[in-house]
A protein has these predicted regions:
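Intrinsically disordered, low-complexity segments enriched in small/polar residues
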Residues: 1-60, 64-67, 75-128
């Protein structure tokens, strides 16, 4: 019982343990008729397959696990293009998005782009 109380103290939140994060996958393909298929999962959670029309946003929230090993990866298909990528990796993404605790991924014609504020995107993945 003492371990649980200490683990949930404010210091735990400072170090990112139990911190809540949000991840968004947005269909930003130029063609209005192009549907994007997204399936995201972690070792513990399969979030299922989602069909996104132009402008649609699939999102979820979660807390980083005690061991700070939380990882979500996504398989994205857009027409002939597809990519599997890490949508959240606690070792990298949490430090990149620690100010907002939110990660945005835009699926575009040129690849998959990343942002912490849904305004300033940079290309993260090339279609393969």
């Amino acid at each position: 019982m003492a371990f649980f109380v200490l683990g949930r103290s404010s210091n735990a939140y400072i170090f990112g343990i139990f911190q809540e994060y949000k991840v968004h996958i947005i269909n930003d393909i130029s063609s209005k008729s192009e549907q994007v298929i997204v399936r995201c999962q972690s070792a513990d959670n399969d979030l299922g397959e989602h069909y996104l029309n132009k402008g649609d946003d699939f999102h979820w929230h979660f807390r980083v696990n005690f061991f700070r090993s939380t990882l979500f990866f996504c398989h994205v298909k857009a027409g002939e293009n597809e990519k599997i990528f890490n949508a959240f990796n606690v070792g990298y993404i949490s430090s990149t998005c620690e100010d907002t605790s939110t990660c945005f991924w835009a699926v575009r014609d040129e690849g998959i782009f990343f942002s912490c504020d849904n305004e300033n995107y940079s290309k993260a993945y090339q279609w393969a």
